[in-house]
């Protein structure tokens, strides 16, 4: 199911996702990237407002950005190969964060 998301450039790391009940929820963007192998853009995000010591669930979606860059459409990750790539990139990202 595609979900609408948008963000305000003043809050560059926040996206708002409308859930199945029509309620908007804020999510903080961990990072986004483009994959040439799958010809898609991806975003990894988690519920906003979580403390640094709290365990968080990181979510991943592919997305299509609108022409103005203010809104887009989240799409589910479709294949095991995509998940493998995302997990590898996330592991590298987290390892780099631990080194800092």
From Swiss-Prot:
Pfam families: DUF1292 (PF06949). It comes from the Bacteria. InterPro entries: UPF0473 (IPR009711). PANTHER family: UPF0473 PROTEIN CBO2561/CLC_2432, UPF0473 PROTEIN CBO2561_CLC_2432. Belongs to the UPF0473 family. HAMAP family: UPF0473 (MF_01448). This is UPF0473 protein LMHCC_1068.
């Amino acid at each position: 199911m595609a979900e609408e998301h948008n963000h305000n450039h003043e809050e560059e790391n926040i996206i708002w996702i409308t859930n199945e009940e029509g309620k908007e929820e804020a999510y903080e963007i961990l990072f986004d990237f483009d994959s040439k192998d799958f010809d898609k853009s991806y975003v990894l995000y988690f519920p906003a407002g979580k403390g640094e010591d709290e365990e968080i669930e990181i979510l991943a979606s592919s997305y299509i950005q609108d022409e103005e860059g203010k809104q887009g459409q989240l799409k589910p990750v479709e294949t095991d190969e995509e998940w493998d790539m995302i997990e590898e990139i996330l592991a590298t990202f987290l390892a780099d964060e631990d080194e800092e």
